[in-house]
Amino acid sequence: MSENLRIQCITIDCHDPLRVAQFWAAALDWQITEQDEIEVVIELLDGSPEQGRIPDILFLKNPDKKAGKNRLHLDLRPLDQAAEVARLEALGAIKIEIGQSEYEETTWVVMADPEGNEFCVLRARA
């Protein structure tokens, strides 16, 4: 990674930053580290971008309605795909169809968080 430039955070626009941040903090087992009425930040429990770890996720209040499929999404690789999908559904995610069933050998499950932001749960680690 460049010492001159690093990714600080991935930003997700949403209507209710706290609600969406709470979902993702529970889903990823991260913690909320900053919070106000406009934005909420979650971080990995044992590291931060400042320590050269993965970026934070920033949930930013945005009044605009979601229009179409996300241009960027997270792919999650679990130990057990079926168990993880069930756990995420219990947290408030839903399975969605965005055309993935057109592929004969689909190995991922497309889901949406409580505000409809898409993400994928990949097949289990080999």
Where are these regions (language model features)?
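Short phosphate-binding/catalytic loops that engage adenosine nucleotides
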Residues: 93
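A short acidic/small-residue loop/turn micro-motif
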Residues: 103, 125-126
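Core segments of cupin and vicinal oxygen chelate
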Residues: 2-4, 11-55, 84, 90, ...
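Vicinal oxygen chelate
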Residues: 7-16, 44, 62-88, 107-112
